[in-house]
């Protein structure tokens, strides 16, 4: 049959590339699960009353090349000026060896958070290096593996200061007046819900204020002044005040460590260690504290432990601090860090080493000195005599200066009264400095770089002697070994080989949606048009960004059934927080600020209660029935008891139990009946797109995990994006921004993230995904995710009971396998199964969540039937091994499961086990074998012997 031109153009080709099972495989799987078609299967699973009659109108599918061309044209509307605005964001030079071998490498960006340390030793080592960089530069005792951004880190520092403060009756937090404005904005937002009184004043007036539990200072102020706070910190410590200091990684290469001056907490952005500005993110924040405060630290901490053979191994330490365990009592609701970006910064430090970093920092400072000297020679006055990279220059005719700068395609900081701000960076050249002279003085400035260089080289006093670093940094061999590109390339590859990512196997983690992050989706994030924009550049220079964000927002509005979308939250946890704040402020606008009770089902993700607590709400748990559904009677009773104090319910759909609850609309109606709002957690949105929507169901607000449903990669534990969709009545209450206030932003509320659009530079990934899939492709993705989960559940249910099912024994896009009966019979646990899967080349499913003693499996639509069968075969083989333990063929204390995973070292060592070497290490044959580099981790040892900095190189050999 002759094909038409439209058929030959094959504009929906990407759909087949994104969805794993082809048409024939889908039919085979449908036959296995007992359904005639995908539509019939969905009809059996999703309640009829919430199914959409027509798919959302987000356009037709298109090819990868057409989408890239379309987005390239949009990106071309951005204007790439030289931005010297500063305020925590500078241009960088990302080493190409890191860009190509790490940032653009799926072996790095498709990995998951390292909850399974045996398959994560490579990025754990890199994160440990990041912590070592942080420790060396801050002069403190313990560091985290990154937070979301500098402003969020400041808010976390405030919360931590209150937790550890001995001044229990003090309720005031002092912020120095010259912190970055976006930092102050986020701190104020967080303080409001905690009931803290934020005082903003000059740092030298802090001692005039009483009842202060914590202080936030900035070592290099937002307009560039270097502060020696050593004396002030000593006076504050005498009053038992917790002192936090915001610092800059590059400045710290030359400046004394705040920890050495007595600071309790030091934080800042690691952006300028190789991470592009990207119109605001994503960027990793660093965070360090004194050892005595380690158990009150927010975020993830990488620690050194031992494996079962006594070998050094790395893991995430002290996880009992985190929300997935402590829920509303957690130190923070943050469950996303910025691993990919922290690893870029870490590898940047490894590649340049201490000498290279000092050279870069020295060059930046020298050029700043030259600029300062030249301007002063022309009669201009500097506001500050002490600076590192930023000058605050008083100008008589500011408008003329800014006009000349614009003509030269230069952005200066313009919000300082009577002055302009200029921040130089590692990309600044002597030619750039000459252009700055032209902008500020005029074309006839008559200044010569070499002459000025000789002058400042002889007499530079811009860094006070007391503030010059006098100790060595980055002395560990890892920072002094890999400086040739060959060595660096091999080091990164060696780290990558230790880890298991999507480029090697399915990652069947429930509630995590580890789907394909297509190459075409990833390409635009490194385009200079997106990567090089400063988040506070004039809005007319970012027209391409605004067009892309507006289109993506419009698509998300249509896909969610909401009326508006706010792009600011830069993680799912931040999205939850922002959504709950919108609810809180909505109630307050109606003079119902007393509404502070948040109902949360017992099955909820731990982030939900942690976010509710952060938003100033009381958590009341709603029971689930024996089938895992929300107990409507208990819900109604709790809602009635809350009465006029009911704020909202947080509910996940499909439920965290992997079921489409038939009564979801009734749940919404009950909460609305008592004046509450419905927060529908977007974690499982991949089972809704094109089939139903939160707005259609009856919810008022949701966050969307763009790093799950909409293809932003997990990056080994971040970045993420968590924009919120809201109904119209909540739109005025979503986060705003104090620096960037443009037409189209919905609100003047406080910010939750440092940048107005969060991690804007990764939004093109989701734009590309939706554009290439189109409405029909997105629906097919959800349908196939559901098919894949039901295929696994059907084939495994005889070996492993499926804990919760809906109508007709069906599951949603994930299923929970109940291991508890097997453990009772045999002693083999879900942990043993998870570790044995490593020998088969798989990352484990989610363990013991939401029910202890279970495994939650989410295959996603991107996995082919071949890969699903490989996983099923592995699980069935493991079940057969469990049966051999049960039959007494292998003792409980010595079998392939309890000894898993098995390493190459064991293969060539003395063998005293009752099973063969071949069964141990090649249970699935020889093809494409993944080798873990360590055996099972000793978690207890790691927490009892906490060590969170680099170990000797010999430990890795």
From Swiss-Prot:
InterPro entries: GcvP (IPR003437), GDC-P_C (IPR049316), GDC-P_N (IPR049315), GDC_P (IPR020581), PyrdxlP-dep_Trfase (IPR015424), PyrdxlP-dep_Trfase_major (IPR015421), PyrdxlP-dep_Trfase_small (IPR015422). It comes from the Bacteria. The modification N6-(pyridoxal phosphate)lysine is found at residue 708. The keyword Membrane does not apply. GO terms for cellular component: cytosol; glycine cleavage complex. NCBIfam families: gcvP, PRK04366.1. This is Glycine dehydrogenase (decarboxylating). It comes from Klebsiella pneumoniae (strain 342).
């Amino acid at each position: 049959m002759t094909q038409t031109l439209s058929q030959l153009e094959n504009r929906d080709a990407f759909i087949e590339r994104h969805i794993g099972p082809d048409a024939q495989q889908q039919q085979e799987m449908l036959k296995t699960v007992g359904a005639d078609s995908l539509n019939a299967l969905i009809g059996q699973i999703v309640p009829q009353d919430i199914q959409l009659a027509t798919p959302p109108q987000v356009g037709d599918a298109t090819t990868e090349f057409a989408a890239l061309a379309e987005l390239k044209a949009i990106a071309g509307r951005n204007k790439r000026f030289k931005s010297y605005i500063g305020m925590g964001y500078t241009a960088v030079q990302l080493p190409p060896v890191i860009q190509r071998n790490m940032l653009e490498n799926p072996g790095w960006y498709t990995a998951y958070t390292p909850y399974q340390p045996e398959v994560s030793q490579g990025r754990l080592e890199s994160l440990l290096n990041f912590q070592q960089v942080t420790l060396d530069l801050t002069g403190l005792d313990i560091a985290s593996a990154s937070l979301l951004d500098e402003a969020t880190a400041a808010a976390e520092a405030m919360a931590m200061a209150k937790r550890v403060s001995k001044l229990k009756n003090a309720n005031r937090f002092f912020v120095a007046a010259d912190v970055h404005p976006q930092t102050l904005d986020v701190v104020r937002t967080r303080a409001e819900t905690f009931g803290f009184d934020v005082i903003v004043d000059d740092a030298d007036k802090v001692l005039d204020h009483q009842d202060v539990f914590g202080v936030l200072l900035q070592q290099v102020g937002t307009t560039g002044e270097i502060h020696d706070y050593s004396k002030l910190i000593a006076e504050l410590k005498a009053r038992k005040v917790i002192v936090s200091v915001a610092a800059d990684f590059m400045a710290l290469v030359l400046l004394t460590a705040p920890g050495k001056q007595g600071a309790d907490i030091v934080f800042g952005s690691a952006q300028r260690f190789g991470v592009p500005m990207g119109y605001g993110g994503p960027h990793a924040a660093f965070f360090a504290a004194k050892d005595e405060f380690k158990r009150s630290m927010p975020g993830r901490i990488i620690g050194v432990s031992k494996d079962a053979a006594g070998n050094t191994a790395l893991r995430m330490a002290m996880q009992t601090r985190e929300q997935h365990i402590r829920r509303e009592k957690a130190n923070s609701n943050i469950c996303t860090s910025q691993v990919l970006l922290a690893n870029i910064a870490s590898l940047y430090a490894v590649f340049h080493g201490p000498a290279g970093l000092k050279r870069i920092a020295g060059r930046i400072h020298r050029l700043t000195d030259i600029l300062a000297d030249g301007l002063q020679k022309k009669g201009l006055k500097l506001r500050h005599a002490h600076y590192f990279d930023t000058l605050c220059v008083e100008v008589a005719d500011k408008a003329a200066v800014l006009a000349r700068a614009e003509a030269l395609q230069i952005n200066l900081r313009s919000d300082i009264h009577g002055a302009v701000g200029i921040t130089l960076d590692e990309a600044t050249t002597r030619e750039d400095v000459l252009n700055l002279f032209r902008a500020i003085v005029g074309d006839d400035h008559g200044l010569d770089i070499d002459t000025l260089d000789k002058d400042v080289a002889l007499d530079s006093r811009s860094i006070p002697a007391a503030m010059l670093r006098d100790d060595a940094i980055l002395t560990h061999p890892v920072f002094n070994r890999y400086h040739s590109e060959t060595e660096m390339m091999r080091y990164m590859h060696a780290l990558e080989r230790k880890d298991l990512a999507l480029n090697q196997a399915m990652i069947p983690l429930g509630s995590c949606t580890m789907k394909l992050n297509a190459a075409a989706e990833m390409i635009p994030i490194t385009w200079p048009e997106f990567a090089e924009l400063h988040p506070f550049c004039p809005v007319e220079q970012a027209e391409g960004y605004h067009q892309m964000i507006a289109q993506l927002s419009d698509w998300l509005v249509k896909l969610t059934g909401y009326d508006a979308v706010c792009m600011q939250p830069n993680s799912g946890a931040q999205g939850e927080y922002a959504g709950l704040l919108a609810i809180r402020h909505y109630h307050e606008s109606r003079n119902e600020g007393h509404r502070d009770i948040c109902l949360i089902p017992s099955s909820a993700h731990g982030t939900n209660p942690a976010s509710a607590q952060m938003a100033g709400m009381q958590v009341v748990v709603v029971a689930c029935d024996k089938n895992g559904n929300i107990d409507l009677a208990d819900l109604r009773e709790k809602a009635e008891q809350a009465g006029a104090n009911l704020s909202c319910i947080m509910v996940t759909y499909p439920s965290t139990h992997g079921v489409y609850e038939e009564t979801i609309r009734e749940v919404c109606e009950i909460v609305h009946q008592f004046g509450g709002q419905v927060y529908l957690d977007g974690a499982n949105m991949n089972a809704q797109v094109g089939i139903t929507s939160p707005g259609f169901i009856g919810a008022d607000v949701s966050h969307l995990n763009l790093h799950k449903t909409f293809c932003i990669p997990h990056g080994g534990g971040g970045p993420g994006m968590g924009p919120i969709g809201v109904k119209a009545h909540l739109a005025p209450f979503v986060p705003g921004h104090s620096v960037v206030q443009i037409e189209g932003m919905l609100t003047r509320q406080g910010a939750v993230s440092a940048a107005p659009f969060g991690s804007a530079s990764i939004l093109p990934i989701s734009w590309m995904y939706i554009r290439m899939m189109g409405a029909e492709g997105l629906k097919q993705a959800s349908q196939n995710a559901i098919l894949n989960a039901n295929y696994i559940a059907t084939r495994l249910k005889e070996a492993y009971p499926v804990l919760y099912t809906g109508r007709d024994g069906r599951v949603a896009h994930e299923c929970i396998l109940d291991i508890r009966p097997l453990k009772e019979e045999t002693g083999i646990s879900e942990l043993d199964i998870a570790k044995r899967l490593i020998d088969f080349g798989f990352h484990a499913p989610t363990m013991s969540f939401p029910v202890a003693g279970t495994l939650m499996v989410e295959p996603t639509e991107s996995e082919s039937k071949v890969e699903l069968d490989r996983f099923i075969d592995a699980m069935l083989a493991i079940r057969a091994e469990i049966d051999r333990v049960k039959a007494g063929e292998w003792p409980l204390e010595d079998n392939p499961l309890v000894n898993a995973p098995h390493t190459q070292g064991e293969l060539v060592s003395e063998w005293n086990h009752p099973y063969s070497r071949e069964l141990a290490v090649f249970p699935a044959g020889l093809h494409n074998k993944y080798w873990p580099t360590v055996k099972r981790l000793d978690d207890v040892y790691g927490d009892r012997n906490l060590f969170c900095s680099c170990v000797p190189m010999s430990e890795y050999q």
